[in-house]
Amino acid sequence: MNVLEVMKRLDDMPESYKTMSMEEMEVRVRAIKERFGKRLFIPGHHYQKDEVIQFADATGDSLQLAQVAAQNSEAEYIVFCGVHFMAETADILTGDHQKVILPDMRAGCSMADMADITQVERAWPILQELFGDTILPLTYVNSTAAIKAFVGRRGGATVTSSNAKKMVEWAFTQKERIFFLPDQHLGRNTAYELGISLDEMAVWDPHTDRLEYKGDIKKVKVILWKGHCSVHENFTVRHIEYIRRTKPDMNIIVHPECSWDVVQQADYAGSTKYIIETIRNAPSGSKWAIGTEMNLVNRLMHEHPDKEIISLNPYMCPCLTMNRIDLPHLLWALESLERGEIVNQITVPPLIAKDAAQALARMLALA
């Protein structure tokens, strides 16, 4: 069975939803939301399509949405418009009476999938042999529940792009070194901002089971997992150079999941929330080239017509896996609920959920 056949099997939505008009689907979704009332809660990630985000009861980043879902204790059903790891986090943080549903099971995250738990468990004893008991693991919330649990069992914590600096500082009060999963770029950019040189960072390659470093291994303070965001890695220094040459008065703002070179040459770098707030607070008439996911960039263009906003990469595509969540899948999930049928429920095994919750709790305690 090829990859396309596997992906198709993961999608159980009837064909009839694909031929329905947008207007009819919108009417049906609104009616279901009204009938369910507070029993239904729909979180929508910033990177979702407008056709979906219009029905979100809350918008935000992955952790923020999971927390808001947990606070809505009256909601029996959390229909999470995001990707798989986000729905897992929501399941970990919400109550036992709440059911988390992902409208399309094909909505994964390539970066989260780059840190497989088997690979991580294979790497850990090798790193322990190299450095002894001097390493604390940290994982970006953009990771699977199994990775969060691995980190939680070893005294580590999760981080977000908003609090990564604070969490790395905390980690160094616990151990001499950190093992940062799964996004090497966020880890590198954060550590560098804290004054750690590139020579004091190493990269663990899970495909060769080797540590890549320059200089003295004894001076390594940060071990970065060799993972990345497929969207943000598509912004390059050449894109920045082109903007500087053709639009010298344009501000460049990027997400810290971009490479170190890109972040260093940008005018501003920060989380999705930071980007949104920076654009919102910018003066009318200001010009911005944004290095992040295209659905969000398009939304910012629409919300701020008084500002000139473009994508840093003019040929950028939206996050393909995030884009799996569309109006037909949302409607299908909701109508299934009305029939008493729960489709695509996300359930994290209790032992994994318990350890993953510890990693999340350590971070939230420092918030």
Curated annotation (Swiss-Prot):
InterPro entries: NadA (IPR003473), NadA_sf (IPR036094), Quinolinate_synth_A_type3 (IPR023515)
Catalytic activity, EC: 2.5.1.72
Catalytic activity: iminosuccinate + dihydroxyacetone phosphate = quinolinate + phosphate + 2 H2O + H(+)
Superkingdom as given in the UniProt entry: Bacteria
Cell location: Cytoplasm
Needed cofactors: [4Fe-4S] cluster
Residues bound to iminosuccinate: 45, 62, 140-142, 161, 255-257, 272
Binding residue positions for [4Fe-4S] cluster: 109, 229, 319
A GO-annotated cellular component: cytosol
Entry's family note: Belongs to the quinolinate synthase family. Type 3 subfamily.
Function: Catalyzes the condensation of iminoaspartate with dihydroxyacetone phosphate to form quinolinate.
Protein name: Quinolinate synthase
